[in-house]
């Protein structure tokens, strides 16, 4: 939900802004994805990686989500585009679901547009968050 506060670490913000600049120069077909991500970054509450709540989805976090329409549980790791691999459930931050989940907390519900409507997911749990594990530079 767009009005919910999301958290973004200053380390993730720096890397994501650099990535946006690089992609803007090289791949115009991703313009809409980049704009969506930038919109999310602009509304996020900036936090130090050492102070981010341990229940927040940050870059390289692995999370358990529930599709509120189907009841299906999904496990995804949120990654940078170069590391994306759907076979390993690694979702790019530039994928609509990746942009949508960044910064949300366990218990939150978020949604994003798909060709046939809107999907709604609930964050059921975090299986791994780099910052909570002391991995501040992943």
Name these PLM-found stretches.
Residues 1-53:
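N-terminal intrinsically disordered, low-complexity, charge/repeat-rich segments that act as generic
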Residues 6, 56, 119:
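Residues that recognize and position ribonucleotide moieties
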Residues 21, 68, 128:
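Residue-level marker of positions within ordered structural domains that often coincide
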Residues 36-82:
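Long amphipathic N-terminal alpha/beta scaffold segment
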Residues 62, 72-118:
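Non-DNA-binding regulatory cores of transcription-related proteins
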Residues 87-90, 131-138:
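Short, solvent-exposed secondary-structure boundary/capping segments
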Residues 104, 128-129:
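Surface-exposed strand-loop junctions at beta-sheet edges and helix termini
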Residues 123-126:
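Conserved hydrophobic positions within beta-strands
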């Amino acid at each position: 939900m767009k009005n919910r506060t999301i958290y973004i670490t200053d380390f993730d913000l720096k890397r994501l802004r650099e990535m946006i600049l690089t992609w803007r120069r090289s791949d115009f077909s991703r313009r809409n994805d980049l704009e969506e991500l930038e919109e999310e970054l602009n509304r996020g509450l900036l936090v130090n990686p050492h102070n981010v709540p341990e229940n927040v989805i940050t870059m390289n976090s692995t999370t358990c989500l529930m599709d509120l329409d189907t009841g299906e549980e999904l496990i995804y790791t949120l990654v940078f585009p170069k590391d994306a691999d759907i076979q390993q459930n690694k979702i790019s931050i530039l994928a609509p679901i990746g942009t949508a989940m960044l910064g949300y907390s366990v218990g939150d519900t978020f949604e994003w547009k798909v060709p046939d409507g809107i999907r709604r997911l609930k964050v059921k749990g975090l299986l791994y968050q780099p910052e909570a594990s002391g991995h501040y530079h992943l």
